[in-house]
Amino acid sequence: VEGYTIEECDKPDGVGTTITLKLKDDTDDEKYSTYLDQYQIQSLVKKYSDYIRFPIRMEVEHTHYNEEGKEPEVHKAIETLNSMTPIWKKNKSELKDEDYNNFYMEKFGDYEPPVAHIHSKNEGVATYDALLYIPARAPFDYYSKDYEKGLQLYSSGVMIMEKCADLLPDWFSFVKGVVDSEDLSLNISRELLQQDRQLKIIAKNLEKSIKNELAKLLKNDREKYEKFYSVFCLLYTSDAA
C-alpha cells in the first residue's frame, strides 16, 4: 500500500478510538441541533443502547435551586447513561417476582403487574434470551385496527426493532416482552429479518413457551387464568367466528 505515513500520536489517553461526529446545519425541515440536547441524548441511549455491556458516559448538567432570589447553581458531572446489565441476562435465582413486575411496568408503561412472566434462555440452533409477559389488562387500542403486535428485538443488547411482529402469532398478539439474540445482525433490514431462519426458530420456540405457560396457569392457578381469559377472550371468540 502506498501513500501513507506513520507518526507519533499525541492523544493524551494513549489508547482507544475517538470518533468525532459533526452535525449538519439546521434546515426548515430538519432540526439536527436537537441531537445536541442533553435530555435527547439520554433518551436515545436509554431507548436503543441501555443494555450494551459497555458504559456510555457523558458530562451531565444538574441545576440546583437555592434560596429564593439567588441564582441557581449548575453542577457538571460525568455519569453513566446506560444500565448495561439487562434483567433477562440475569439468572432466575437472582430475581424475585417484584423485579420482573417492576421491569414490566416501567418498560411497557403499565400500572398493573402482569398475570405471568416467562424468562427463558436458549442455546443451540438459535441462541437467545427472552423475557415475555402476559398482561393483566388489554391496551386501550387492543381491539382496534391501530394496534400493533410485536416484541422488542435486541442484538447483543442493542435494540434493532421496537415491535417485531414476526415473533408472535396473531393469537398471542397480547404478549409483551423482549428477545435478545447474538445471532442477529445489528443492521439487518426488516425485509431480510422476515426471511431470517434464526428468527423463525425463535418465534416457534416462543409460541411453544407461551402455550405451556397458559396451560400451567389453567392447571395450577385457575384464578389467574380466568383473569387472563376474561380480558382476552374476545380475541379467541372473534377468531373462531
Mark where each language-model region is:
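A glycine-rich phosphate-binding loop feature that marks nucleotide/adenosyl-phosphate handling sites
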Residues: 61-65, 120-124, 191-196, 227-232
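Conserved small/polar residues in nucleotide/adenosyl-binding loops
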Residues: 236-241
